[in-house]
C-alpha cells in the first residue's frame, strides 16, 4: 500500500526527540505561553525570514485575527481565489466583510492576475493571496496592484511552509501572513495550531492582543479579543519538526519531480507547472484527469491512496449561495471535477512515485 499521508511513520522517525520535548513540557507544567512558545515563534520567524511571529490556535484563527488587526473599512470587499479550503473565504465573512471570488490559473492553481484586476471596485480593501498546494502566487503583480489601489495583501500560507518567491520565503512579503499547523501540513502539530507573520511591529502587537482577549497585561484588557493561543506542547513539537522541515521538503520535491517526469507526456493527464521564480514545496501534488473518480477508484483497488483538493470550488459551495456573481465560466469551477491529489510527503520515495505513475499509465 502507498499511503496518502503517514503521520505514524513520521513520528517513529523523530520519536525520541518528540517524546523528550513533550515530557519536558509536562514536567515544567507551563502549558500556555511561556518559553516553549517564545522559542518556537522566534525560530519560525527566522526560518520564514520575518521579523515577528504570533502563535495562535489554528490557521483559520490566524486569518480572522489578521483581517481584524488590519482594521479594514467596515463591510469592505476582500478578494479570494475560487479554489482553496473554505477558511480562506470563511474568515472574510466572519470578520464582517464581503467575499469577492476571483479565478485561478489552470497550470499552477494560484490567483489569476487578470481576473483579479477585473474584480477590484472602490469597495475593495484587501486580497487573500493563497499560496495553494505550496506554490507561491505572483506576488510582484499583487504588490503592484495593491499599491495602485491601496489594498492590503493577506498571505494565506497554510500550505506553503518554506516556499519561496524569488528567493524570499512567503509569509512576510505582503502585509501579513497566516499559517496553519494542522497535523497533515508540511509542518504539522499533534493537534491544532497556527501562526501569524509580519514585518510590522505594531501589527504583530495588535494580533497578539486580539489572540489573548485584547490583553495589555494580566486582567487588564484594552478591547474585546478572543482566546486563540498556541500551547506549549504543540510549540515544543513544532520546534522539533521545524529542524527536519528542509529535509522533508526536499523529499517532497524529489517525489513531485518524479511524478512530473513520468506523467508529463501522458495523454489526458495535466500535471502542475511550476513558475521558474518560485520554490514549490508541494504540500499537495494535484493532477487533472477527465475520469478523476474512476481513476481514483482504480488506484484504490491497487492500494494507492489519493485525495481530492478540492471537490467543490468555493463559489459552488452551499455556504456561499448568498454571494451574487457569475462564476460558471471560472476555470476553478470547471476543473474541480478533474482534480486528484497523489500521495506525497516525507514517506513517499521516488520509487513510490514511479510505482503510482506506472499504475496511472496502465489505467
What are the residue ranges of the model-derived segments?
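Helix C-cap/helix->beta junction micro-motif
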Residues: 95, 148-149, 302
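Hydrophobic "anchor" residues on beta-strands that sit immediately upstream
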Residues: 2, 77, 151-152
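Phosphate-binding glycine-rich loop
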Residues: 29-77, 91-95, 101-103, 168
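PLP-dependent aminotransferase class I/II
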Residues: 8, 20, 37-43, 47-53, ...
Amino acid at each position: 500500500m502507498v499511503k496518502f499521508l503517514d503521520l505514524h511513520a513520521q513520528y517513529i522517525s523523530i520519536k525520541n526527540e518528540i517524546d523528550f520535548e513533550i515530557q519536558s513540557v509536562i514536567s515544567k507544567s507551563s502549558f500556555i505561553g511561556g518559553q516553549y512558545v517564545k522559542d518556537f515563534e522566534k525560530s519560525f520567524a527566522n526560518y520564514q525570514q520575518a521579523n515577528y511571529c504570533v502563535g495562535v490556535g489554528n490557521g483559520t484563527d490566524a486569518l480572522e485575527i489578521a483581517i481584524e488587526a488590519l482594521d479594514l473599512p467596515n463591510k469592505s470587499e476582500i478578494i479570494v481565489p475560487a479554489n482553496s479550503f473554505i477558511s480562506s473565504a470563511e474568515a472574510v465573512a466572519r470578520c464582517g466583510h464581503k467575499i469577492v471570488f476571483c479565478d485561478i490559473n489552470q497550470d499552477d492553481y494560484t490567483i489569476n492576475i487578470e481576473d483579479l484586476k477585473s474584480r477590484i471596485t472602490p469597495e475593495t480593501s484587501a486580497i487573500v493571496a493563497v499560496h495553494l498546494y505550496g506554490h507561491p502566487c505572483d506576488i510582484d503583480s499583487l504588490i503592484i496592484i495593491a499599491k495602485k489601489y491601496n489594498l492590503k495583501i493577506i498571505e494565506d500560507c497554510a500550505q506553503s511552509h518554506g516556499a519561496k518567491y524569488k528567493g524570499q520565503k512567503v509569509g512576510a512579503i505582503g502585509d501579513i501572513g497566516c499559517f496553519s499547523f494542522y497535523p497533515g501540513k508540511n509542518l504539522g502539530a499533534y493537534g491544532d495550531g497556527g501562526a501569524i507573520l509580519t514585518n510590522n511591529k505594531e501589527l504583530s502587537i495588535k494580533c497578539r492582543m486580539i489572540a489573548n482577549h485584547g490583553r495589555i497585561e494580566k486582567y487588564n484588557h484594552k478591547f474585546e479579543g478572543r482566546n486563540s493561543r498556541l500551547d506549549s506542547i504543540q510549540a515544543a513539537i513544532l520546534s522539533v519538526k521545524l529542524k527536519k522541515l528542509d529535509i522533508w521538503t526536499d523529499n517532497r520535491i524529489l517525489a513531485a519531480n518524479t511524478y512530473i517526469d513520468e506523467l508529463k507526456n501522458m495523454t489526458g493527464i495535466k500535471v502542475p507547472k511550476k513558475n521558474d521564480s518560485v520554490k514549490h514545496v508541494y504540500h499537495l501534488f494535484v493532477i487533472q484527469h477527465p475520469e478523476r473518480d474512476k481513476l481514483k477508484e482504480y488506484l484504490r483497488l491497487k492500494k494507492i491512496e489519493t485525495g481530492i483538493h478540492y471537490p467543490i470550488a468555493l463559489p459552488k459551495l452551499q455556504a456561499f449561495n448568498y454571494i451574487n456573481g457569475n462564476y460558471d465560466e471560472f476555470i476553478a469551477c470547471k476543473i474541480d471535477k478533474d482534480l486528484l491529489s497523489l500521495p506525497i510527503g516525507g514517506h513517499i520515495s521516488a520509487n513510490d512515485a514511479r510505482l503510482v505513475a506506472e499504475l496511472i499509465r496502465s489505467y
